[in-house]
Amino acid sequence: MQQLPIEKYDELLAEKCRKLTALLAPFDAPALTVFPSPTQHFRMRAEFRLWHDYSENRGGNLYHIMFDKTTKQRYRVDQFPVASQLINRMMATILPLLKEQDVLSRKLFQIDYLSTLSEQIIVSLLYHKTLTDEWQEAAQALKVRLRNLGFSVQIIGRATKQKICLDQDFVDEELSVGDKKYVYRQVENSFTQPNAALNCKMLEWAIDCTRDSQGDLLELYCGNGNFSIALAQNFRKVLATEIAKPSVAAAQFNIAANQVDNLQIIRMSAEEFTQAVNGVRAFNRLKGIDLQAYECHTIFVDPPRAGLDSDTVKLVQKYDRILYISCNPQTLCENLQILSQTHRIERAALFDQFPYTEHMEAGVWLMRK
């Protein structure tokens, strides 16, 4: 079992606080609000390579493995305390069942897990072979056995140019945010926030920052609607963009499931939306959507690790209030070099989404000077 340095958690978090405070110092940021993580079982998704060991017996054995970042050597993982308890239970349960069936275990090279606080889990089995009807029958029987053992599980098989979904390729998460509960459909192989407890804290912080806002909200990179659905209560209307089709479909479901009636999602990238707003080119996807009907005084961005491109930074700068969540404080600070010319940081936060690593999730709330 991989041991976590739980006794060092506070020390590691304090070091992150020092680093982020130093990064934000040139921008006169106020003191950080710090949101610690649970010290174990905080990660809702995990992926492992599979090792077939034929040295132990004729049937061979099957193990989850990971690779040491320094030596690149593989090591066996029977329990993974970083991951949710549900993932750990599934890890221990599924391998013996897979091993019983050659059609399920042969050429299986990776298992991905996606779990929820609502106790649902997707298990994706990745193969170096074509998946047949025989595989599908065996996988269906495996699913029944796991359900009989108390798991609310979906099983997906993947191979080159193949995806076999036995029932559905999503789970429905329930998050408690303040005094409200939100339902979020999460699709296999699409982005979701990995640390559910910290996601709830990020949503609460974002809601608190934008309380008593005037006008409308624009969100770029909305994913499955994680933030825009929770923030919609603070605005007259919300316009959100997302490029990935599965995420857009999940967002539309989530809008209906949470009975949000003031949120419109458009399938386009942040870069395309910038072109549309600036009149550089027209998009069929915007037919029927009157951008002039929105009075967006606030913009929310949660970009990929690369941060915002220069054109999008200029677009963001046009708004009076900017809420920026970043998974890479280095690129956040690069963007702040420009944004700080017109805006000041009113609030700053550190969300410890990734304990025991150097990765930091930061949030800043900016107002026009």
Curated annotation (Swiss-Prot):
Reply yes or no: does the keyword Methyltransferase apply.
yes
- Give UniProt keywords alphabetically: Methyltransferase, S-adenosyl-L-methionine, Transferase, tRNA processing
Catalytic residues of the enzyme: C327, E361
Q: Name the residues that bind S-adenosyl-L-methionine.
A: Q193, Y221, N226, E242, D302
SUPFAM superfamilies xrefs: S-adenosyl-L-methionine-dependent methyltransferases
Q: What role does it play?
A: Dual-specificity methyltransferase that catalyzes the formation of 5-methyluridine at position 54 (m5U54) in all tRNAs, and that of position 341 (m5U341) in tmRNA (transfer-mRNA).
Q: What is this protein called?
A: tRNA/tmRNA (uracil-C(5))-methyltransferase
What's the source species for this entry?
Actinobacillus succinogenes (strain ATCC 55618 / DSM 22257 / CCUG 43843 / 130Z)
Which gene name belongs to this protein?
A: trmA
